[in-house]
A protein has these predicted regions:
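N-terminal glycine-rich anion-binding loops that anchor highly charged ligand groups
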Residues: 33-39
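Short amphipathic alpha-helix segments
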Residues: 14-31
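Non-catalytic surface loops within mature trypsin-like serine protease
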Residues: 9-13, 50, 82
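C-terminal structural segments of small proteins and small subunits
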Residues: 57-83
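Short glycine-/aliphatic-rich beta-strand segments at the starts of folded cytosolic domains
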Residues: 1-13, 42-45
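Short, charge-patterned binding micro-sites
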Residues: 39-52
């Protein structure tokens, strides 16, 4: 079976986010928002092949932890998870 997985990878709270700071600066400069607290992340969609839901979730978790994120600096959250 195949599963569609959506993943959001973000910097951990204690890690400085220069891209987020840059967006915050532009928002303040343009008068759109004074302090939006922007944090920049990465969004992934992938298709995982597995025999069942549990195996697919384990495989997606392994992919996220080993390939899509740097566990020292980033955390990830598996969002939508659906059987195709």
């Amino acid at each position: 079976m195949k599963y569609n997985v959506e993943v959001l990878v973000t910097l951990k709270e204690n890690v400085r986010d220069p891209q987020g700071t840059a967006v915050d600066t532009v928002l303040k400069r343009t008068g759109l928002e004074d302090n939006a607290g922007v944090r920049v992340g990465k969004y992934f969609t992938l298709t995982v092949s597995a025999k069942n839901d549990d195996e697919a979730k384990e495989k997606a978790d392994r992919i996220c932890g080993d390939v899509l994120s740097n566990p020292i600096l980033e955390s990830y959250k598996i969002g939508r998870f659906e059987k195709l």
